[in-house]
A protein has these predicted regions:
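Short, polar loop/linker segments at the starts of domains and inter-domain junctions
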Residues: 598-602
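Short linear proline/tyrosine/threonine-rich motifs used for host-factor recruitment
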Residues: 554, 561-563
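Surface-exposed interfaces of beta-sheet-rich extracellular modules
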Residues: 586-589
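Charged, non-catalytic interaction/linker regions at domain boundaries
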Residues: 92-345, 352, 356, 482-513, ...
Length: 614
């Protein structure tokens, strides 16, 4: 451990390094579930349909907020009156519609006005309290508070790219000689934590420079000329987040470009070849950032190893289904625009690409197709990605490389906790121990998969709402960087899985439903097999999982696990299914077991392919 930090500070630092990595796996991207964002998105949605008795997204958003509040022990303890009243109102609306949309809207508006700032300060104080201790008393609670704190910061408008940039200053800048100073910097908790920023944004204009300068003067847009290049000046003392500040001001500067384009044949634009110059009072330095850091998304890409197989399969598909072929080309054309358009436009293009690829399934509504298929496509991949990423971080440079198969062998041994406790990094160890608890118990895994499905669905809904606001209301401020990172992460996995299924089609001839039907049928079949297998491993009645998590369960010591040869994720779960058949029968109602027994052979043949690392 870095001796500059206490145990609690080191935990928070590594939490941030994982969450703010711009190439993080889907499960590491901040989930946005916090008081300020949840209440604000409900208020906004209710305001659009407050007098109309129509089906909208309110119920899904309210249910998500309710579930978040149930887990918020800090809010419950520190502000019990507000917490209880808020929970009661949401429950009344969800369960029985005892209150109208209008009444709920007014109530939530008042709660946000009175309590949003006090809630944030309460969370910040709790973070301060945790960080003030040398040791970590309760790691689960600490991580939960850190999550809430980070989500609140992002929900209040701080760009994740700025937070990522700030990590590079944490260890080296004298302004953050005390770790709490860094925390105050990203949180902007008090006026004295606000920076003074001088920013120069380069402009490319070959002619009509005089006209541009004249318009700048009339619109009170400051500028400087350095080495014959015009720079528009941005000055601000109300924020630390220069990414958001620059993006906001670029909209204003672009209006000057538009005026010149409208009245002349000249096309001024931002000069992406030159860097943006920034001077920060808090950081006490002048520095430059590449222009593309502001206007381009940088993050994960689909796996390049699939490229050549995809090209071959796509060419073969062209011979049998020309409609399918053109749908795929349309998808790729929208996704590719990401490289040539600024983030807000690319956000919409990437949603169109996702809708287009999912609509190949023949579900008419693009949004409904995305909601139905994306969770089924994502879950096994994001679980595998997340575990693998933490294995790399936990073991690289410490011990030998540990792969997913090795990890599963470790967690099925009786002393797995002792083995994992040797991991030096507390946060990485915490994540892998949590995965061990989930994977070691079929019920835990089943419940986790259902929670994960809910998480993906609420992310998709938020992305869709932002897309609609941007497209239909022309609200340029609707774009949020964090949602774009999630959308890109989702799309990359979907396109990978789609082309992998296309490549692996056993029957290369056109089926009577079409190639697209074949591919999406594979996704739903795999999903059904996975859930049915987990049901057989533990219980059959799905509602029991959802309504009661305190049922007596088979003791882990009574579960036989035989490990032979190279173990994969699916082998591990399949061994549970095969070797505990008699034990599992006791937990399956007799009237249902005959049908389940008939399915067992199918499950054993197909389940092996679900979780394997591709």
């Amino acid at each position: 451990m870095d001796k500059r930090y206490t145990d609690s500070e080191y935990l928070f630092k590594n939490f941030l390094l994982s969450k703010l990595n711009l190439k993080a796996t889907y499960l590491d991207i901040p989930d946005n579930n916090c008081f300020y964002l949840c209440i604000s998105e409900i208020i906004k949605n209710l305001s659009l349909n407050i007098e109309k008795n129509i089906n909208d997204y309110s119920n899904a958003l309210i249910k998500n907020f309710y579930n978040c509040l149930i887990k918020d022990s800090l809010f419950r303890e520190k502000q019990p009156a507000v917490y209880g009243a808020l929970l009661s109102k949401l429950k009344d609306f969800l369960d029985s519609n005892k209150i109208s949309k209008k009444e709920l809207f007014g109530f939530l508006l008042d709660v946000r006005k009175r309590n949003s700032l006090s809630y944030f300060r309460m969370v910040f104080s709790e973070v301060e309290s945790i960080l003030s201790k040398e040791t970590i008393n309760n790691i689960d609670y600490s991580i939960s508070i850190f999550n809430t704190f980070l989500n609140e910061i992002i929900a209040r408008g701080t760009d994740i790219r700025f937070l990522n940039f700030s990590l590079s200053e944490m260890d080296t800048n004298p302004a953050f000689d005390k770790f709490i100073n860094y925390v105050k910097y990203i949180a902007e908790v008090n006026p004295y934590n606000k920076d003074v920023l001088d920013i120069l944004v380069p402009i490319k204009i070959d002619e009509e420079k005089d006209m541009f300068i004249e318009i700048c003067d009339k619109r009170n847009q400051k500028y400087e000329i350095i080495d014959d290049t015009i720079y528009c000046k941005i000055y601000d003392r109300n924020t630390n987040d220069f990414f958001t500040l620059i993006e906001d001001q670029m909209v204003r500067i672009s209006s000057i470009f538009d005026l010149i384009k409208l009245y002349t044949y000249h096309t001024p634009e931002f000069d992406s070849e030159l860097p943006i110059k920034i001077k920060s009072k808090i950081l006490n330095k002048e520095f430059e950032i590449p222009f593309n850091y502001i206007i381009r998304f940088t993050g994960n890409k689909p796996y390049s190893k699939h490229l050549y197989n995809t090209i071959t399969s796509l060419d073969a598909a062209k011979e049998t289904d020309i409609k399918f072929y053109h749908q795929v080309l349309n998808t790729l054309s929208y996704a590719e625009k990401d490289l040539s358009r600024k983030n807000s436009n690319a956000f919409v293009d990437n949603w169109i690409a996702l809708e287009t690829i999912c609509s190949i399934s023949e579900i008419k509504s693009g949004y409904e197709a995305v909601q139905f298929f994306v969770p089924k496509i994502l879950i096994t991949t994001i679980v595998r990605q997340n575990i693998t990423s933490y294995l790399i971080k936990a073991y690289k440079n410490y011990f030998k490389d540990v792969k997913l198969e090795d990890f599963l062998k470790i967690i099925t041994s009786e002393n797995y906790e002792e083995t994992l406790n040797k991991i030096p990094n507390t946060y990485n160890k915490y994540i892998l121990l949590n995965w061990a608890k989930i994977l070691n118990n079929p019920l835990n895994l089943y419940q986790y998969i259902n929670r994960l499905q809910d998480k993906i669905n609420i992310d998709i809904l938020r992305i869709y709402i932002l897309r609609n606001e941007y497209v239909h209301s022309c609200n340029l401020n609707a774009f949020q960087t964090l949602e774009f990172y999630k959308l890109k992460n989702i799309f990359n996995i979907v396109i990978d899985e789609f082309f992998r299924c296309l490549t692996n089609r056993k029957d290369k001839d056109e089926s009577h439903e079409g190639i697209g039907f074949d591919i999406f049928n594979q996704f739903t079949y795999k999903w059904d097999i996975m859930l049915k297998s987990l049901n057989l491993m533990f219980k059959v009645e799905e509602h029991i999982y959802k309504s009661d998590t305190t049922k007596i369960v088979p003791d882990r010591t009574n579960m036989t696990i035989k490990l032979e040869g190279n173990l994969t994720y699916s082998d591990y779960l399949l061994n549970l299914l095969k070797n505990n058949n008699e034990i599992l029968k006791k937990y399956i109602p007799k009237k249902d077991y005959k049908q389940k027994d008939e399915d067992l052979g199918i499950l054993e043949n197909d389940f092996i392919n679900i979780f394997t690392d591709i």
